[in-house]
Amino acid sequence: QPMTGLTAEKHDSFIQPTDDRTVIMEFSGKELVMGEPDASSFPSGGLRATFEARGYTAWDPTSFAFIKDHSLYIPTSFVSYTGEVLDKKTPLLRSEAAIDKAARRVLALFGKFPKRVVSYVGPEQEYFLVDEDLYSARPDLSLTERTLLGHESAKNQQLDDHYFGAIPSRVQEFMKDLETECYKLGIPVKTRHNEVAPNQFELAPIYEECNLANDHNQLLMSVMKRVSRRHNFRVLLHEKPFNGVNGSGKHCNWSMGTDKGVNLFSPGKDREDNLRFITFVVNTIMAVYKYNALLKASIASATNAHRLGANEAPPAIISTFLGTQISEILDKFENSSIEDAIEVDDKKGLHLGFGQIPELLLDNTDRNRTSPFAFTGNRFEFRAPGSSVNCGSAMLALNSAVAYQLQQFKKDVEALQAEGKSKEVAIFKVLKAYIKESKPIRFDGNGYSDEWKEEAAKRGLDCQNSVPLQYDAYLKPESIEMFTSTGVLTQKELEARNEVKWEVYIKKVQIEARVLGDLSLNHIIPVAVRYQSVLLDNIAKLKETFGDDPEFCDMSEEPRRLVRKIAGHICAVTKKVDEMVEARKKANRLTDMREKAIAYHDSVAPYLDEIRDHIDDLELMVDNQMWPLPKYRELLFIR
C-alpha cells in the first residue's frame, strides 16, 4: 500500500531455467517472504530518487494471503533500502503495537493481564453507481471521478425516499455478485442498503483487527470497480461526485479489545470494570482533544474537502459526542469522591405499546450524525474519513494518539503513587483532571450550525479550512514527539509524508483545472455559440417576416435577452479559464511544495466553482438536445 493511497502489486512466477535450457517450477519461500521492487517510482517525499531506487517488501503475516485470478497475493510492508517507511501499512502495524503495549500497561493497574490488546475497525463503505455509457460520456467523471459541472436535478434527495428504500434489481444483481467475490477473498461483508442520495449505496463489513480491516477495505474498493463493469456500471468512490446531494464517507467504527474478548469501551458489572471503562473512554477523549488538529489532518484531502462541512457530513472541526448518559457519568465522576459508587446503566427497554412487536433494547447513547467522532455504545465512530481513502492514515493517527495518551496516563498515576497516594486514589485524581481538561472537545449539539464554529474557535479547537495548512499539524512539535516516542514514524518520515500529501493535493486540483478548462473551451462554449446562432437566426427571420411592425419587438424580446445572457456567460467562462491558466502557471513556478499547494488552494481552486456557476446557468438556457454532456437527472436516476 504505497503512499498513492491505493494498492500496488507485482507478479512473479516460479519458473526457473535449468542448464539444459528447459524450465522447472521451483518454489522458494525466500521469494515469498521478501521482494525487491523499485521504490523511486512511487511517491516518497524525497526519501527515494531514481539513482537510489532500491526498496524492499516484507510479508505481513498478520493479514491473510489470498488467491485472485489464479495468483497468490501476499500482503506486504514496503520500506526503502535505508529503512524508511514508504507505505501506509507499516506505520499502521507499528501503531497497533504501540496501542497493545500501552493498553496492557494500563490494564495492569486494574489487575488485568491480557496477552494482547488490539484495535478493531469496521469501515462502512459508501459509493455511487453510474451507468457505464453515461459515465463514458462525461470526461470529468472519467478523469476526476466527480462532475466538475452540471446543474442540480429538479428532483434529487429532498423527498428522503431513497435511504433504506427498495434496492433496484440491477443494483441488487451487482451487489450479489460483489458479495460473492468478497467472500471468495475472505472479506466479511455483512450489510448492504440504499444511502440518502439517488444512486448512492453502502456496504458494511464485520469488525476486524485494524490492519486486516484496512487491507480488506482496500481490496473491497478494487473488487467493486472490477465487478461493477460486469453489470455495465461504474462505481464512484469520490467523496463528492455530485453537487446538491450527499457525498460519500467511510465511517470507521473503532474500538479496543483484549485477547480474552473484553471490549474496553463496554462497561462492566462491578466497580473495577466500570472504572476501567471510564479510564479508556476518558483517555480516548483526551487524545482526541490534544490531537484534534492532527486527526483532522489525517482525513484531509482535496476530495474530502468538498464533503466535510456540508449539511450531510461532519463539520471540518473535530469534536466528540458522548450522549446524555455518558456525559452525565463523566460529570458525576468529576464531582464525586473515591467512595462514591461508579455505575453505568445497562440497556433500557422500550415497549412500543402492542404485543406483536417485542420490547426493544435501547443503547446507552443516542446518535448525533453531525459529530465527526461519536461514542455509539461500545465503540467510537470516526465519521470524517472520505470514501476513497486508505483509512490506515486516520487509524494510525488515532491509534498513535491514544497509545501516547495511555502512556501519559500511566506516568501520571505512577507520579501520584510516588507521592504516597494509593493506586485507586491516583487513578481517580488523574481521571478527574483529564475530564476537566478535555471538556472543550465534548459537544453534543448541532455540528452544522454557525454557532458551533464560533464556539469551537473560542474553545481553542482547530478550525483551519485550508487543506494544505491542515497538513502542518503533522509537523507540530507535539505530533513529532507523539509519533517518535511511540515508534510509529520518525520526523524524517513525517516530513516525507507531508511532501507527498502536498504534492497529491496539487495534482488533484491541477487535473480538475485542466479538465474543466478543456470542457469549457472545447465542449460547452461551442455548443453555447451554436445555440446563440439559432436564436440569432430566429430573430433575423422574425425581422424578415414582421419588418418594422411593433409586434416584432415583443416577439423578439425573449430571444434577444437570451442572446445577451448567453454572450455574457460565454465571455465570463472564457475570461475565467484564461485567468485560471495564468494562476496555475504562477503557482507552478513555486519550488516549495507547501507554498505551491497553498497557491493552488488559494488561487486556482476558487476558479473551479466560479466557472462552474456560469456553465450551470448555460445548461438551463441551451437547447437540451444540443447539450453535449449527460445531465444530473440521467446520471442519478438511470439505474
Q: Which residue stretches match the model-derived regions?
A:
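Glycine-rich, acidic/polar active-site loops that bind/position phosphate-bearing ligands
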Residues: P2-L237, F242-K250, S255-E499
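C-terminal amphipathic alpha-helical interaction region
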Residues: Y434-R639
